[in-house]
């Protein structure tokens, strides 16, 4: 999964839920500091800055420190899914989607959508673009890579 895919999924979620969460002024994204969502990943941060301006909502990135994979909620969910399909042959997209939609995690069923977009890898920004992104980001001095704010700036015509 690329950083562009992560932001596309966030944008998709925001469009679907914006009316319900309209009073919200800041989204807090709880992230695991993986390679695609790292706060120094320039493409990820540029896409988030652009999202903030389009959505007119601030974003706070709250990262977990390194930990064992069994402590990661997403990986626990993956383990539950593996138990649910119990060695079944996943030879068709319909089988994968069916098992995933039917699993139960935290008393609910996941929303399953197939993403068919092909994302480029190795996307980089120019030095000037990186500086423009970093100028829009507020890092807490003692928590530089663990807590990052991207404030919405009314009237800013950011275009990344």
Please describe what each predicted stretch is:
Residues 1-19:
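Active-site beta-loop-alpha junctions of metal-dependent nucleic acid enzymes
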Residues 9, 43-48, 76-81:
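Alpha-helical scaffold elements adjacent to nucleotide-binding pockets in ATP/GTP-utilizing enzyme cores
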Residues 18-23, 51-55:
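Short, conserved, surface-exposed binding loops centered on an aromatic residue
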Residues 26-33, 61-67, 99-100:
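Extended hydrophobic secondary-structure segments that form protein cores and membrane-embedded regions
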Residues 31-44, 65-71:
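Acidic, metal-coordinating catalytic cores used for nucleic-acid/nucleotide bond scission
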Residues 44-62:
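Two-metal-ion acidic nuclease core segments, chiefly of the RNase H-like superfamily
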Residues 61-83:
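RNase H-like two-metal-ion nuclease catalytic core shared by retroviral integrases
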Residues 87-160:
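C-terminal accessory extensions appended to soluble enzyme cores
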């Amino acid at each position: 999964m690329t950083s562009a895919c992560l932001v596309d999924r966030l944008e998709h979620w925001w469009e679907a839920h914006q009316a319900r969460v309209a009073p919200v002024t800041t989204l807090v994204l709880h992230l695991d500091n993986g390679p695609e969502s790292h706060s120094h990943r320039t493409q990820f941060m540029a896409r988030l800055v652009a999202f903030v301006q389009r959505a007119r909502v601030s974003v706070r990135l709250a990262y977990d420190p390194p930990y064992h994979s069994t402590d990661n909620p997403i990986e626990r969910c993956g383990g539950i899914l593996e138990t649910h399909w119990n060695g079944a042959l996943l030879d068709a997209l319909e089988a994968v989607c069916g098992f995933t939609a039917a699993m139960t995690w935290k008393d609910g069923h996941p929303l399953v959508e197939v993403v068919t977009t092909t994302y480029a890898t190795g996307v980089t920004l120019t030095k000037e673009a990186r500086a423009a992104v970093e100028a829009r980001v507020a890092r807490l001095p003692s928590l530089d890579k663990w807590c990052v704010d991207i404030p919405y700036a009314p009237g800013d015509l950011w275009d990344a």
